[in-house]
């Protein structure tokens, strides 16, 4: 696929061949730059397509997008919730190739996205946080503390209950790597969610317990 065809696909509504643009983008620096900027575009269709392709491409070759670190880091402070979501997820994908340890200077600020004014932003932040957990063992204690701090956020109670399903999914991915002390904290958190007001969270907590032999 040539660059012109890839560009045409990215502006289409729900194109069936969207992910066929990934390889051309990985091979073409100009297309990559356009994709990154497109992920912050005003046009919803174009932005949505760019974001989907961006994360597929970053998963395959994150190093190709490391030069755009600053653009993504700026995104987490954008007044636009969609931009904050993109920035949060992109930084997580780049953590494994962060040779200049740029994450260090913004990490505490980054973790505050769990308390974002938009629940959507917190959801996507949580969705990719395990990528940082695996890439940066030195940040693991802070990540666990962050995951267990949701009740301290400003989210309305109903939204907190929804987000706890995301947190349980995170904890499921990292549970076997936790210290005994942190496992006890997590188990206590999971047991509390069996009484959650969210059916999804209750179900997720129950499945977590069965998987990890808690009951």
Predicted regions and their residues:
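Conserved hydrophobic register position within alpha-solenoid helical repeats
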Residues: 21, 50, 87, 125, ...
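Amphipathic alpha-helical scaffolding segments comprising HEAT/armadillo-like alpha-solenoid repeats
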Residues: 2-4, 26-39, 62-75, 100-113, ...
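Hydrophobic residues within the alpha-helices of tandem HEAT/HEAT-like
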Residues: 52-59, 87-97, 128-135, 166-176, ...
């Amino acid at each position: 696929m040539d660059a012109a065809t890839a560009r045409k696909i990215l502006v289409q509504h729900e194109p069936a061949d969207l992910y066929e643009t990934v390889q051309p983008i990985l091979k073409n620096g100009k297309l990559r730059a356009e994709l990154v900027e497109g992920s912050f575009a005003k046009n919803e269709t174009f932005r949505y397509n760019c974001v989907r392709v961006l994360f597929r491409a970053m998963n395959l070759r994150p190093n190709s997008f490391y030069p755009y670190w600053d653009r993504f880091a700026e995104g987490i402070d954008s007044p636009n919730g969609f931009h904050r979501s993109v920035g949060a997820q992109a930084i997580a994908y780049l953590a494994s190739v962060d040779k200049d340890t740029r994450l260090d200077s913004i990490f505490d600020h980054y973790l505050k996205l769990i308390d974002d004014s938009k629940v959507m932003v917190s959801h996507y932040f949580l969705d990719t946080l395990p990528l940082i957990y695996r890439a940066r063992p030195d940040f693991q204690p802070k990540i666990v503390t962050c995951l267990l701090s949701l009740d301290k956020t400003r989210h309305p109670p109903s939204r907190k209950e929804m987000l706890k399903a995301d947190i349980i999914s995170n904890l499921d991915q990292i549970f076997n790597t936790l210290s005994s002390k942190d496992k006890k904290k997590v188990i206590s958190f999971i047991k509390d969610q069996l009484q959650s007001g969210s059916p999804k969270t209750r179900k997720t907590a129950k499945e977590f317990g069965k998987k990890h032999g808690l009951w």
